From Swiss-Prot:
Effect of gene knockout: Mutant is slightly more resistant to copper. Mutation does not attenuate growth in mice.
InterPro entries hit by this protein: DUF318, UPF0718_permease
Taxonomic source organism: Mycobacterium tuberculosis (strain ATCC 25618 / H37Rv)
Annotated protein name in UniProt: Putative permease Rv2963
Transmembrane segments: 30-50, 67-87, 111-131, 132-152, 208-228, 246-266, 278-298, 312-332, 361-381
Length: 406
C-alpha cells in the first residue's frame, strides 16, 4: 500500500512537471503566434517578388559588393535552415561563388524579417539590432577566413562532390521558385491574382518547412524553463562573474546550439530561456547564429561538399560566430545597449484576453485566407515535392500561375 502511494506521488509529480512544461510551451506559442504569421507573410511578399533565376548571375565572385548582394538576397529567401543550406548548394552547382553562396545561406537564416520580429517580441529590440549588426560581421569574418584557409583545390573537390547531387533535407522546397512570373510594376505584380497565389504558396510552404523545428524549439524551451533551475544556468554561464561570462558566452553559446538540434526560428524561444538564465549578450547572439551548425546540418554538409569541407565549415563558421559574438558584446556594451534586466518574460503558465489575443485572432484570419488560397489554387500537390530530389523538375507553380494570370 505504501509502495503504491509512493508510485502514485511520483506519477503525479512527473505528470505535473510535464503539464507545467506544456503550459509554458503553449503560453509562449500564443505569445508569438501573431508575430510569426506577420513575419512569414512579409517574407512571402518578398520571396514572391524576387525571382530565383536572377540570383545566380549576381553571385559570381567574392568581392565585397557581391557578398552584400548575396546577404541581401539571402535575407529575402527562405528562413528554413535546411532549405537555405540546400539552396546554397544549388546556387553553387549552378556557378555561384562558394563564399557568396555561404553568405547567402547565412543571410537566409539569420537576417530574415520574421527572425527580427520574434527576437524583438520575445527578448527586446536590442537583440534584433544585434542580430542584424552581427550577421554582416560574421559574414565578413567568414570571408576573411575563407581567403586564408579555403584554397582552389578544396573548392574544386567540394564542387565535384556537390555535382553528385546527394539529397540532404528540404531539397524539393529549396528547388521551388514560387515567385510571380508575370511582368509589370512591383505593385501590379503583387496585387494581381498570381501575386496573391505566390504569396499564399510561399507562406504555407515556409510554415511547413520550419514547423518541425519551431515545435521542437518551443517544447525544449518550455521543458528547460519548467525543469532546469536558473541557478544551474547562472553557474554554467558564469553569470556572477561578468568579465568571464563575456568571454565564455560566445564560446559556449554555439556549442549549446549544436547539441540542441534546433534551428531556424525554433532556437529563439530557447535563446530567451538562456538569456534569462544568465548567458552573456554576445553569447546569446552567437547561439542564435549557430543554427547552421547543428548536427543534422553538419551531416548534410558532409553529403553536399565532402567530409573535409564539412570540417572546414564547422571550424570557420564557429570561429566567425565567436568573433561576431565578442564584437557585438563590445559594441553594444560600450554604447550601453545591452539590456540591464533579463526580462524575456513571455513564459507564464496562463493565457489572458489582451492585445496579444486580438492580434492573434486578426492574423489567424489572414493566415486562414492564405491557406484557403493555397488549397484552392492547386498548392496541395506541392507538399509531396518538399523533400524531393534536388534535380527533379518543380514547375507546378508555373502551370497554375498561367491559369490565374488572365
Amino acid at each position: 500500500m505504501t509502495s503504491t502511494k509512493v508510485e502514485d506521488r511520483v506519477t503525479a509529480a512527473v505528470l505535473g512537471a510535464i503539464g507545467h512544461a506544456l503550459a509554458l510551451t503553449a503560453s509562449m506559442t500564443w505569445e508569438i503566434l501573431w508575430a510569426l504569421i506577420l513575419g512569414f507573410a512579409l517574407s512571402a511578399v518578398v520571396q514572391a517578388v524576387v525571382r530565383r533565376s536572377t540570383i545566380v548571375t549576381l553571385l559570381g565572385d567574392d568581392r565585397p559588393r557581391t557578398l552584400v548582394i548575396a546577404t541581401g538576397l539571402g535575407a529575402a529567401s527562405s528562413s528554413c535552415s535546411y532549405a537555405a543550406v540546400a539552396l546554397a548548394r544549388s546556387l553553387f552547382r549552378k556557378g555561384a561563388n562558394f563564399t557568396a553562396a555561404m553568405a547567402f545561406e547565412i543571410g537566409s537564416t539569420n537576417l530574415v524579417v520574421e527572425l527580427g520580429i520574434i527576437l524583438a517580441l520575445l527578448m527586446g529590440w536590442q537583440f534584433t539590432a544585434a542580430e542584424f549588426v552581427g550577421g554582416p560581421i560574421m559574414i565578413l569574418v567568414l570571408a576573411v577566413l575563407f581567403r586564408l584557409f579555403v584554397g582552389a583545390r578544396l573548392i574544386d573537390a567540394a564542387r565535384e562532390q556537390a555535382e553528385r547531387g546527394l539529397a540532404g533535407s528540404m531539397e524539393g522546397h529549396a528547388a521551388m521558385d514560387m515567385s510571380i512570373k508575370r511582368e509589370g510594376s512591383f505593385w501590379r505584380r503583387l496585387l494581381s491574382p498570381p501575386g496573391f497565389t505566390s504569396i499564399a504558396h510561399v507562406f504555407v510552404m515556409e510554415w511547413l518547412a520550419i514547423l518541425r523545428d519551431l515545435i521542437l524549439g518551443l517544447l525544449i524551451a518550455g521543458a528547460i524553463a519548467a525543469w532546469v533551475p536558473e541557478s544551474f544556468w547562472q553557474s554554467f554561464f558564469l553569470a556572477n562573474h561578468p568579465a568571464w561570462s563575456a568571454v565564455w558566452g560566445p564560446i559556449i553559446g554555439p556549442i549549446v546550439a549544436i547539441v540542441s538540434f534546433v534551428c531556424s526560428i525554433g532556437n529563439v524561444p530557447l535563446a530567451a530561456v538562456l538569456w534569462n538564465g544568465g548567458i552573456s549578450f554576445g553569447g546569446v547572439i552567437a547561439f542564435i547564429f549557430a543554427d547552421l551548425l547543428i548536427l543534422p546540418i553538419l551531416n548534410i554538409y558532409r553529403k553536399y561538399y565532402g567530409a573535409r569541407m564539412m570540417l572546414v565549415l564547422l571550424g570557420t563558421f564557429y570561429a566567425s560566430m565567436v568573433v561576431a559574438g565578442y564584437l557585438i558584446e563590445l559594441l553594444f556594451g560600450t554604447t550601453n545597449l545591452i539590456p540591464s534586466q533579463r526580462s524575456a518574460t513571455v513564459m507564464t503558465a496562463e493565457i489572458s484576453w489582451n492585445y496579444t489575443t486580438w492580434l492573434n485572432v486578426i492574423f489567424l484570419v489572414i493566415a486562414a485566407a492564405l491557406v484557403v488560397r493555397f488549397i484552392t489554387s492547386g498548392g496541395l500537390p506541392m507538399l509531396r515535392m518538399m523533400g524531393g530530389s534536388p534535380d527533379a523538375p518543380h514547375d507546378h507553380h508555373d502551370r497554375h500561375d498561367d491559369h490565374l494570370g488572365h
